[in-house]
Structure formats: C-alpha cells, structure tokens
C-alpha cells in the first residue's frame, strides 16, 4: 500500500507503548542519561528532569511523537509497504529517531550523510534486506545488546528481533 494511505495501527501504537514502558516521572535516558530525560511512553522532546505526566497525557504525547516520526518516514521511504512493515518501521523510528547528517544516525538519515542502510535497501526494493537492517541497531551506547548473557540491554535486542520478524510478516506487535 502506498505510504500516503498508511497510518500507525492501534496495535502498532500499543506495541510502542509496551516496548517503551511507562514512567510517571522523567527519568534519565538509558544511553544519554540526564542530558535527554524520557517521560511517559518514551517521549524526550521538551522533557526536563522533574517533569511528571499521567497515562492519558503520556499517550497523547506519544501519539504526537508518532505522527512526527511517521512524517519523517513518509519523506524518506519511496516504496509501498504493508501495514505490518509500516508499523515495525514506525516503532523503530520512534526508538532511534530519524537521524541527521553530521549529527546522529537514524531511521532515515545517516550521520555520514545520505540515507540509512535500511532506507537504501528498502528504496532499492530489497524488502527482506531492509527488515534485516533493523538488527544493525543493536547497541545501547557502546554496549552490544545482542551479546549472549547481556543483562543491561537485552530488552532492546529482543525488541529488534521482534520488529525484524514483524517486518518480515511474522510476529505482530
């Protein structure tokens, strides 16, 4: 289906909320610490340490964040997607951000400039390769979350494996 007709499904939004978890009070980001506090269901924009929220407010903010990431995804992806692929990619973009040339790697753009590996593969018609590229996002800071026995960020790796399977048409959010 063409991207213009797609929106994150209800199941996709629930998947993001479950993956991110809920925090009533702003907490340090697991990787960036207090420099990027997170609140509610993973919201970082405009959040300061000490901020608080309620579940309905957090869900509204998460939905606003989702819409921002959907916009970025729709600008960089040029091929049609199935709903399950779209939901997986929005979830990933929500977690890693869109990226910015010269600043940070992300879903759409690489730090080195140009599209991310995932987007290059996807726009080139390599749908399976794009799904596999989800697994490239396996680090939290300098920690490889895919390493067996890892206890500090194994949840991130589990999330990536689930998103890859979902993207390939397997597990649902």
What residue spans do the PLM features occupy?
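Surface-exposed patches in mature extracellular/periplasmic domains of secreted proteins
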Residues: 25-29, 73-87, 133
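A general alpha-helix detector
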Residues: 68-72, 88, 114-117
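A broad detector of the eukaryotic-type serine/threonine protein kinase catalytic domain
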Residues: 71-74, 94, 135, 139
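Solvent-exposed coil/turn segments that connect beta secondary-structure elements
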Residues: 42-44
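Short N-proximal segments of mature Sec-exported proteins
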Residues: 85-100
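Helix-adjacent hinge/juxtasegments
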Residues: 54-67, 71-79
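Amphipathic alpha-helical segments that form the core helices of the histone-fold
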Residues: 39, 90-94, 119-120
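Long, amphipathic alpha-helical surface segments
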Residues: 1-36, 47, 53-63, 99-173
């Amino acid at each position: 289906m063409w991207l213009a007709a797609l929106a994150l499904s209800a199941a996709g939004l629930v998947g993001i909320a479950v993956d991110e978890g809920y925090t009533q009070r702003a907490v340090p980001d697991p990787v960036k610490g207090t420099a990027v506090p997170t609140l509610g269901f993973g919201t970082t924009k405009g959040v300061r340490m000490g901020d608080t929220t309620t579940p309905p407010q957090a869900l509204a903010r998460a939905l606003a964040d989702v819409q921002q990431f959907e916009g970025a995804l729709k600008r960089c992806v040029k091929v049609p997607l199935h709903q399950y692929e779209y939901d997986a990619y929005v979830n990933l973009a929500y977690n890693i951000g869109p990226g910015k040339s010269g600043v940070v790697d992300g879903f759409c753009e690489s730090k080195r400039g140009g599209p991310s590996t995932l987007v290059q593969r996807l726009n080139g018609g390599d749908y399976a390769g794009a799904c596999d590229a989800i697994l490239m996002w396996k680090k939290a800071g300098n920690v490889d979350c895919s390493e067996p026995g890892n206890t500090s960020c194994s949840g991130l790796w589990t999330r990536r494996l689930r998103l890859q399977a979902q993207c390939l048409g397997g597990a649902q959010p």
